[in-house]
Amino acid sequence: MMKLISEELLDSVSHEARESSRLRMNYNFHESLDSPIHRLLNALEPGTYLPPHRHTDKEETYVVLRGSLLTFFYDDLGNVIEKVNLNPSAGVYGVEIPSGTWHSIIALEPGTVIFEIKSGPYKPLPPEDIAPWAPAPSDLEGAAAVSYTHLR
């Protein structure tokens, strides 16, 4: 069955993200977490926090469908080594992140939605692939401080 990516779908997933305590929501196109390729919408609202992490065994691709976001790349000590503003209105649509690269993203606009592609199957990130130098998702003050620092 064909699956259409429409304004209505983006609006729906964005609404769910705004209502979520994490301020983000996925919409999966893949049939199961065991699928060999994961394709999903990821709706992100300003204030959501994705801790810096890496995928040692897979690349990850983001394409911005609506809104804009900053993508950060870090060295092993947590220093920002590159920052990319993904913004379709500026002609920068997406990024492919090599495996093993520490990265995180910050939504800059309400209603930001990305199309994300990576290899499956889904496996929770092992502790060594979640940055030890970054605040945990439960550390709201630390997460806010990281976001503030990155946006300056």
Whereabouts are the PLM-identified features?
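Glycine- and acidic-residue-biased ligand/ion/polar-headgroup-sensing regions
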Residues: 57-74
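N-terminal leader/capping segments at the start of a protein or of a new domain
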Residues: 1-20
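Conserved small/polar residues in nucleotide/adenosyl-binding loops
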Residues: 149-152
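C-terminal end-helix/capping segment
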Residues: 123-144
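Histidine-centered metal-chelating micro-motifs
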Residues: 49-51, 58, 70, 91-95, ...
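A short glycine-rich, His/Asp/Glu-containing loop-to-beta-strand
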Residues: 18-52, 58
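A short hydrophobic beta-strand segment most commonly corresponding to one strand
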Residues: 110-126
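Short acidic-glycine-tyrosine-enriched beta hairpin
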Residues: 77-99
